[in-house]
Amino acid sequence: MIVCLEVLVIVLMRLAWYLAMVAVTVLALLPIEHLQMPVFDWWDKAQHALAFVVLTSWALLLWPHAAMRVALRMLAYGACLELAQRAVGWRFAEWADLVADAVGVVVAWGLVRWLRSQQSTSIESNSR
């Protein structure tokens, strides 16, 4: 019974992650009417990095044994978003956005590694 509940939680968390990915994709491709963008907008880059920290951290926790694949796929997802933005015509692609996405992936990687090291340290100290 407990195993079934754990599996259900994992399945629901993965479903929620996929829905979050769809939501980010939709938001990234929505037309932005009458938006005057500065040449380089730090807030936009911070939003990219934060979105990728959250999505990548979440994915790394859901698929702990596929960390490198998760990181590479998140980078590919960021590149695909930029290409899609270029293709739709009402958005535009920026290399700086892709760099911000990559920063988010790297920060997530480091954060999850640190959290796991803290968890293993805590388990070791509790077993003594």
Task: Give the label of every model feature segment.
Residues 55, 62-85:
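Membrane-embedded catalytic cores of phosphoryl/pyrophosphoryl-handling enzymes
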Residues 50-67, 105-116:
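Membrane-interfacial alpha-helical segments at the cytosolic side of multi-pass membrane proteins
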